[in-house]
Regions:
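Acetyl-CoA-dependent GNAT
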Residues: 5-94, 98-100, 111-113, 117, ...
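Short hydrophobic/aromatic beta-strand or adjacent loop that forms the aromatic wall/cage
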Residues: 60, 164-168
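Active-site acidic-Proline motif in GNAT/NAT acetyltransferases
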Residues: 98-100, 104, 133
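Residues forming the Rossmann-fold NAD(P)(H) cofactor-binding site
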Residues: 108
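Conserved GNAT acetyl-CoA-binding A-motif
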Residues: 111, 118-131
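Conserved catalytic-core motifs of GNAT/GCN5-like acyltransferases
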Residues: 128-131, 142, 147-165
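Helix-turn-helix
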Residues: 137
């Protein structure tokens, strides 16, 4: 069964708790979404608050994918650029599909929904994201149409002696 996507959902308790639970589960499954396992919901909440502040200020939009039970199963944050010379593209952050839903094509569905959401924002011509090297995420994003446009070697320190490249990818929307 396919996910149902909603851009800018009402951020009630169920969405908040669903996003925190999703982020915690993805992180603990090894997902490269800003943390290294193990993490708890208490570790995640301050990062979510940062996104919520940006949403309240109109700088970020939240895309949520709901499963057939109406639970949060996927998310992505679309962050607008404030620099006057870069307002024609946006950032895609914290792209997540719950581990129990992986392998069903939901990641591609999420990426397509994010691209559609970006196309619906006036003046947006491209989507940019970064991903952690060594995870295979760059191959996934390439399969979704993104092109690698840059790489910063050893920019992400996962652990002492385990530095990963920060891979910059771009999806032109034209």
């Amino acid at each position: 069964m396919a996910l149902t996507f909603e851009l800018d959902p009402a951020f009630d308790r169920s969405v908040r708790d669903g996003v925190v639970a999703l982020w915690t589960d993805v992180s603990n499954a090894g997902g490269a979404v800003g943390f290294v396992p193990p993490v708890t919901a208490d570790d995640i909440r301050p990062e979510l608050v940062k996104h919520l502040v940006a949403i309240a200020e109109g700088r970020t939009r939240l895309l949520v994918g709901y499963n057939e039970d109406g639970a949060v199963a996927a998310t992505a944050f679309l962050a607008l650029n404030s620099h006057r010379l870069m307002t024609h593209w946006l950032w895609l952050y914290t792209v997540m599909v719950h581990p129990r839903h992986q392998g069903r094509g939901y990641g591609r569905d999420l990426m397509a929904a994010a691209a559609d959401a970006a196309r619906g924002i006036d003046g947006i011509e491209a989507v940019r994201l970064t991903c952690r090297g060594g995870t295979g995420a760059d191959r996934f994003y390439a399969a979704c149409g993104y092109k690698e446009v840059g790489r910063v070697p050893d920019a992400i320190r996962v652990a002492e002696g385990d530095d990963r490249d920060d891979i910059i990818m771009l999806l032109p929307l034209g």
